[in-house]
Amino acid sequence: GIVAGVATPALADRVALLSSDLTQRQLLDVLQSQHQVCWGTETLRKTVAAMAEGLSPFGHQAQVAKVLSLLQQAADAGGPRKIQLVVGRDGIMLPIRGLKKYKEGATATVSVYSRWGKRLGTVYLGQMPEELQISLSDELTRLLTDVLGQWNGAPLRLSYITDAGFHPTEYFESVLCRMLDPQRPGGYLEWEWVVDYYHACQYIGDLAQVIFGPGREAYAWAAKMRRTLKEKQGGVFRVLRSAGQLRAIRGLVGEESDYESAYNYLRRHSPWMNYAERRRLRVPIGSGVTEAACKTVFSQRFKCAGMKWGIESGAPILALRVIALSGIWPEVRDAVFDSRTTEIPQLPINSTTQT
């Protein structure tokens, strides 16, 4: 049928896919120059919203199928280690009209790594600014639960790689640590949290500035400690010992509170900073995939020059964008159109003709 009363299914599909990447003005120009379609902004927005509403309910199952397909690909390829399912989440500030308190959009990634430590693919989730990021957490939990419930292959290494911000920490403690193992009734899944190595390095830099002040000494010590943190067993404790000894011997150039803040961050999160062991197992130690998702999901589409968004106007674009970036657009589109196809019943053919 006609989508939103204005577009054929083929045109609506084209508009929806382009809207996930192009600005409104760019898309209207493309429609006019390539398709001889002259629309106004209201018609465009109505079509995009209708397509997002139609596609979104089918996105979840397509993402589940995509992750399961990647897991099977990893299983078929073989290798010396476990297949890895790696999850991350992060946030990015968005230019939202009329919203003073909550402006942080949130994204999550679910990636599959081969037994050799190579990333095979990623699916993306996104949420416009929302208090406590409840919708993103629910969507991510549903995706992980369905994937792990349907996977009957080789055991997986489950990794959660984030910074140690409030939302990532709360999700690990309240959801992942309590996630039941579908293969072991009454048991729990063993998620390994890895605090992003590069965030940890920022705190080493802070310690260097407080201990030495600006200059070569601070740079050299921080570089050495970053290598120690990454390459040595118990690296974080070596860093803490070195910082403590230097403080006792030479005192501090900077503020005591700055030293305590950086030192306590490393000490508090030390159980999730065993980077040498993670590297040995070919587990990623940085949240680069999720950091990049903040840019690909949000920045490249929502933070162009002069842009301001409303929550409701941004949601359809975001829904379409995560479907496109996850590489499941054809599957979702076909599922939508198949669900709306009505077969015309065949009338019985009489063997004799009445006159």
Where are these regions (language model features)?
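Catalytic center-proximal scaffold of phosphoryl-transfer enzymes
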Residues: 1-355
